[in-house]
């Protein structure tokens, strides 16, 4: 019994993050306890779920979850993410990182680095656009630029490409992508004045 409770607790802690990252092409499609495993890619499942808990194991344990409560929680998490899509890039980043801050670390070995720590780490080493004030006590509405000279210039070029092979939540690549995005805004031949224009350039930056 205790083993089953421990496994259920381990699964439950991880569910919100995995629901957030579920591969859902059509947001009108309801995410349910029955289709949950089919919407999570194998690599993410192996990375985040407790060791030894396969999709087959989950399907055995899913009978202990209330389907209606699961669907309602999933709908709320996905709605929070979708709402960010209608905001400016800066506001969207603030909203996304706020959502991530509500997720619990899956276990002692899998730590979701807080957004503040990401900004401290990359701000101190590479520079770029930082979302916290000078002493990292609070977020700021307009990101401040930290210039470390050549390292900053080399990394945050408009044509730079970032390979991040160990990202769990995606906050490190998010910081890097925003710096490259701002370089592209600066070099753009056309004024980026609408949310739609921002979104097109942001999507292109992330895709490349």
Label each PLM-derived region with a short phrase.
Residues 2-207:
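Class I S-adenosyl-L-methionine
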């Amino acid at each position: 019994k205790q083993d089953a409770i421990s496994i259920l607790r381990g699964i439950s802690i991880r569910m919100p993050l995995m629901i957030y990252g579920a591969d859902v092409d059509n947001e009108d499609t309801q995410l349910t306890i029955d289709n949950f495993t089919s919407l999570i890619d194998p690599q993410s499942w192996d990375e985040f779920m407790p060791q030894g808990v396969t999709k087959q194991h989950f399907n055995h344990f899913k009978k202990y979850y209330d389907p209606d409560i699961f669907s309602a929680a999933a709908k709320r998490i996905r709605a929070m993410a979708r709402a960010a899509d209608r905001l400016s890039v800066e506001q969207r980043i603030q909203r996304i990182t706020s959502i991530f801050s509500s997720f619990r670390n899956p276990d002692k070995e899998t730590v979701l680095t807080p957004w503040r720590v990401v900004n401290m780490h990359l701000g101190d080493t590479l520079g770029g656009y930082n979302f916290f004030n000078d002493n990292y006590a609070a977020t700021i509405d307009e990101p401040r630029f930290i210039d470390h000279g050549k390292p900053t210039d080399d990394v945050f070029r408009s044509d730079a490409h970032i390979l991040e092979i160990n990202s769990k939540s995606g906050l490190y690549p998010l910081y890097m992508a925003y710096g490259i995005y701002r370089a592209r805004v600066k070099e753009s031949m056309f004024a980026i004045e609408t949310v739609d224009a921002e979104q097109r350039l942001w999507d292109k930056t992330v895709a490349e």
